[in-house]
Amino acid sequence: MGAVGVLALSALCPSALVAQDSATPYEAIDDAGARTAIRTLIADAAAKGLPTSPLVTKVREGIAKRATPDRIRNATSLLVDRLEKASSALAPTRSSEELAAGADALQAGVPASTLRDMRKLWPGKPLTVPLGVLSEMVASGVSQSVATRRVRELLIKGASSAQFASMGTEVRNDIASGLAPNAAMELRSKGVISLLNYQAQVLNGMQPASPAPIRPGTPPKK
């Protein structure tokens, strides 16, 4: 199901949400107890207003990887916990994609307090992409403190989701080319901030010099 379809379905009611799991191949789980437990976990999550599509995906992944029934059940239970924490931290959002991104960030080791802070900074805008980039940066080797600080600065500056996504791609490419993860994050985030500052000055009627191009290997300006 596409993102728009999931959002439309989740807006209906918990009973509509639980219908998302109807196509899940539960019968491929040969342990009846685990099968029942997983169904119950997903039904309970739906009753709480949590998105079930990430849970269904987790079950499918476990089946595809031939994980044991207990491992699939445990993984599903842990994801329910993360979705609950993300829902609390990112309130009042009910976006399936945003809550899933929050759950991924928690799994990457980002504390719930960071999610709450990001929501305060962007109270009316979706955090799906910024959260996804934060998770990817930490997973790519950027220290949590550097990744969090830089993402926070970009939120304050008003970076767009497209700018977040582009920066994330550039950081990954820089790391693949041999640049240290923290240096890549510092370099690329400063490039975005430089552009945002330039755009703000133009909007205010100033005539600033064009921002210098940022290239891999260029030492970040202090």
Regions found by a protein language model. Give the residues of each.
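Bacterial N-terminal signal peptides
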Residues: G2-P14
